C-alpha cells in the first residue's frame, strides 16, 4: 500500500472507526490500482499498514476478491489477459467489454490456491480477519448464481454444486486462520435480475454456509455488477438504507453469527444506531460516509454530530477514479490527501492574513473554511441572498434537495469558525481594495452561456437573443416556468438539462431534450450511477429525447435541428420556449480588476474554468493553504507554471 492509502485508512481509525475492511485483490494480475495481497513480497508493506492501525487501537480485516472486470494484462504494456469466471459471461461496464473464460477444474484449484496464499499473506502481515467477497459479481457469486453459472459439472446445476466453490475456498481460509483470525463471507441478499437468485434463495445459501461452521460473520449486500451497478452504489435518487428490506428477509439464516451490512447509503450515525437497535444487523458498514467525513464516529461520540459532513451521494468518489485518476470527494478535498491535508495538518499560517473570499459556492466556502482554520481573518461575500453557488442550482432540481446538506454543513462550520458572511452584496473591486486585504480569493463561479456556446459548438447560436429563450438560472433561481412546447438544448450532459425537463414536464409542459450525445447525459453522469434513474423519470413524464442532435438556430416559434453525424435537418414548429442548458462560462471580471493590486490573488473553481464541484472545493482548499505563506505562489498562474511537487 502507498503512503496515501495508509494515511487514508489511519485518518478513519483516528476518527473512531472500529473496524477497517480493506478490499484487496487476491491475484497479482489486476487492472485496478489497489493493494494486492498475493505476492509474498507485499507482506512487509501490508504489515506496516496493520501495525499503524493497531497502534491507533483499530482492527483490520482483508477482503479477498477477484472480480470479472479486474483482469489485468499479461505483462507490462501488453493486452489484457482473460477474466476468469464460472462460465462464459458477457459484461460491459463504462465501455469495458469482457467475456469471462469458463475456468477448467485445474484453473479452479489454482484460483483457490491463490486465495489461500493471499490469506496466508494477510495472516503473516498481522490482519485480524479475512473476508471472502462473494457479491458484486465476484467469482464466488458467479458460481453461486444461476444467472452466471451454466456449468454442467460438479460446480454447476444444483444449489449444493453451485455452493461447492465457495465452501471449498472458505474451508481453505478457515485452515489458514486456525482460530486466530475471523473469517467472513460477503454475499448478495438479492441479485435483482431475472434468472438470478433472490431473498428466498439467499436465505438458503446463507443457512448452508452458516451451518458449515466455516465463517464467523456474514456481510449482507444487494445487487450485482454491472447489471445493477446503480443499485450497488445508490445515488441521491435512492432513499437511505434501501437494502434494509432485503437484509431483514435474509439475516435470520445466519443464526447466532453476527451480521454486517452497509444497508445502502448511510447518512448519519443516528441512522446506523437505529438499524442496530432494530436488530436488522449487528454491525453497520460505511464507505462513502467515511470518505466524506473521517471523524464520523468520533464527532457523534463527543456529541458533535452536527460537525459531520454528510455524504450527498453525488458519487463523484467513484466517477473521479475514471476521470481524475484519483478518488475525489465533493465535500472533502482532503480525502486521499490526508498526509498533507488531514485533520491534524491545520497549523497556523506563517503570516496571519486578512482574507477576502468572493463567492459562496463550493470553492469559496472551502477556501473560507480552510483560511479560518489556519488563523486568518476571513470575510466571505456572496452576491445572492444564500450560499451554495452551482450546488444551489442542482439542489433545486427534482429529488436533489439532499445536495443542500453540504451547503448547510459549510455554513455551520464558517459560523463556528467566526467567518464574516456578507450575503446579498455584489462587492466591487473598489470596496475590496479599500478593505486593504492581504489576500483575495475570487470564487465567483460560472453561468450558462447566454449565447448558447457549448463544448459541442463553441460559437454563438443564431437566435440566442429570442424572447423564447430562458436560461437555467431563470428557472431554478428566478422562478420562471415556461409552458406549452418547450425545447431544452442540453450541451453539457450533466444534471441541469434533464433536471429542468423533469421539472417542467411535471408541471404539464411538452418537453423535448436535444443533445449532441448518444444520450442526453454524459459519461460523467453515467459514472455517478445517475443515468438509469434520470432517464426513467423523464420518460415516465413523456419527455422526448433527441440524441446526437443539435440546433442551427432559433427562429420565430421554431428551431432548426440537425443530426451531428449526418447533418440532416428538420424544423420543430410551434415552439413556446427554448432553454439553453449549453455550456458554462467563468465569471471572473474581478480578477482582471484586482490583478497586480493585491499581494495574493487566487481565482479558483468555476471562476478559473467551469468544471465539476469536487474540483472547485479542491482548489478552494489548496489555494487557501497558500494564503499567508511568502514562499508559495501568489496566483494560480504562478502555481500552474511551477514544477509539480509531491504535495496535492
Where are these regions (language model features)?
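Glycine/Thr-rich phosphate-binding loops of Rossmann-like dinucleotide-binding domains
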Residues: 30, 140, 193, 228, ...
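Short, contiguous acidic/charged loop-to-helix segments that flank catalytic cores in large enzymes
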Residues: 233-239, 344-347, 352-353, 393-405, ...
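A Rossmann-like FAD-binding core segment of flavoenzymes
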Residues: 404-449, 458, 463-483, 504-593
Amino acid at each position: 500500500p502507498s503512503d496515501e492509502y495508509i494515511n487514508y485508512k489511519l485518518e478513519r481509525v483516528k476518527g473512531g472507526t472500529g473496524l477497517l475492511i480493506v478490499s484487496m485483490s487476491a491475484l497479482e494480475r489486476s487492472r485496478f490500482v489497489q493493494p494486492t495481497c498475493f505476492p509474498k513480497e507485499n507482506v512487509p508493506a501490508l504489515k506496516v499498514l496493520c501495525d499503524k492501525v493497531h497502534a491507533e487501537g483499530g482492527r483490520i480485516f482483508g477482503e479477498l476478491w477477484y472480480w470479472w472486470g479486474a483482469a489485468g494484462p499479461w505483462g507490462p504494456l501488453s493486452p489484457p489477459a482473460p477474466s476468469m469466471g464460472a462460465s462464459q459471461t458477457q459484461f460491459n461496464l463504462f465501455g469495458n467489454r469482457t467475456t469471462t473464460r469458463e475456468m477448467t477444474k485445474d484453473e479452479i484449484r489454482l484460483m483457490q490456491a491463490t486465495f489461500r496464499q493471499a490469506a496466508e499473506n494477510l495472516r503473516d502481515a498481522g490482519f485480524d480477519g479475512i473476508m471472502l467477497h462473494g457479491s458484486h459479481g465476484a467469482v464466488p457469486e458467479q458460481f453461486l448464481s444461476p444467472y452466471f453459472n451454466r456449468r454442467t459439472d460438479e460446480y454447476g446445476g444444483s444449489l449444493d454444486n453451485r455452493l461447492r466453490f465457495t465452501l471449498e475456498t472458505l474451508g481453505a481460509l478457515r485452515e489458514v486462520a486456525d482460530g486466530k483470525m475471523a473469517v467472513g463471507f460477503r454475499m448478495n441478499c438479492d441479485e435483482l435480475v431475472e434468472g438470478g437468485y433472490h431473498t428466498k434463495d439467499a436465505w438458503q445459501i446463507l443457512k448452508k454456509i452458516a451451518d458449515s461452521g466455516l465463517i464467523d460473520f456474514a456481510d449482507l449486500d444487494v445487487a450485482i455488477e454491472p447489471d445493477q451497478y446503480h443499485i450497488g452504489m445508490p445515488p441521491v435518487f435512492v432513499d437511505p438504507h434501501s437494502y434494509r428490506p432485503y437484509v431483514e428477509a435474509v439475516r435470520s439464516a445466519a443464526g447466532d453469527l453476527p451480521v454486517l451490512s452497509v444497508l445502502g447509503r448511510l447518512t448519519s450515525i443516528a441512522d446506523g444506531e437505529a438499524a442496530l437497535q432494530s436488530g436488522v444487523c449487528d454491525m453497520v458498514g460505511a464507505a462513502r460516509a467515511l470518505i466524506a467525513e473521517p471523524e464520523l464516529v468520533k464527532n457523534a461520540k463527543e456529541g458533535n454530530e452536527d460537525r459531520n459532513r454528510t455524504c450527498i451521494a453525488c458519487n463523484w468518489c467513484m466517477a473521479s477514479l475514471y476521470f481524475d485518476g484519483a478518488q475525489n470527494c465533493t465535500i472533502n478535498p482532503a480525502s486521499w490527501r490526508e498526509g498533507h491535508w488531514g485533520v491534524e495538518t491545520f497549523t497556523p499560517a506563517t503570516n496571519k492574513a486578512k482574507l477576502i473570499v468572493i463567492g459562496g459556492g463550493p470553492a469559496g466556502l472551502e477556501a473560507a473554511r480552510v483560511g479560518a482554520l489556519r488563523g486568518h481573518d476571513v470575510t466571505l461575500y456572496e452576491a445572492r441572498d444564500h450560499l451554495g453557488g452551482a450546488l444551489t442550482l442542482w439542489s433545486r432540481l427534482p429529488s436533489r434537495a439532499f445536495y443542500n446538506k453540504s451547503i448547510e454543513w459549510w455554513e455551520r462550520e464558517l459560523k463556528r469558525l467566526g467567518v464574516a458572511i456578507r450575503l446579498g452584496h455584489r462587492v466591487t473591486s473598489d470596496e475590496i481594495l479599500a478593505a486593504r486585504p492581504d489576500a483575495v480569493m475570487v470564487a465567483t463561479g460560472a453561468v450558462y452561456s447566454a449565447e448558447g456556446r457549448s463544448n459541442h459548438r463553441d460559437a454563438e447560436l443564431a437566435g440566442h437573443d429570442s424572447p423564447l429563450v430562458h436560461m437555467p438560472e431563470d428557472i431554478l433561481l428566478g422562478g420562471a416556468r415556461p409552458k406549452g412546447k418547450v425545447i431544452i438544448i442540453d450541451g453539457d450532459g450533466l444534471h441541469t438539462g434533464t433536471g429542468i425537463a423533469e421539472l417542467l414536464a411535471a408541471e404539464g409542459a411538452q418537453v423535448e431534450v436535444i443533445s449532441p450525445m448518444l444520450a442526453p447525459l454524459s459519461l460523467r453522469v453515467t459514472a455517478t450511477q445517475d443515468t438509469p434513474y434520470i432517464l426513467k423519470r423523464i420518460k415516465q413524464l413523456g419527455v422526448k429525447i433527441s440524441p446526437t442532435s443539435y440546433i442551427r438556430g432559433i427562429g420565430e416559434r421554431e428551431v432548426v435541428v440537425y443530426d451531428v453525424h449526418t447533418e440532416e435537418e428538420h424544423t420543430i414548429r410551434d415552439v413556446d420556449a427554448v432553454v439553453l442548458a449549453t455550456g458554462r462560462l467563468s465569471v471572473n471580471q474581478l480578477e482582471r480588476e484586482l490583478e497586480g493590486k493585491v499581494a495574493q490573488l487566487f481565482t479558483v473553481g468555476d471562476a478559473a474554468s467551469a468544471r465539476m464541484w469536487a474540483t472547485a472545493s479542491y482548489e478552494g482548499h489548496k489555494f487557501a493553504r497558500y494564503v499567508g505563506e511568502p514562499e508559495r505562489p501568489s496566483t494560480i498562474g504562478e502555481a500552474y507554471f511551477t514544477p509539480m511537487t509531491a504535495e496535492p
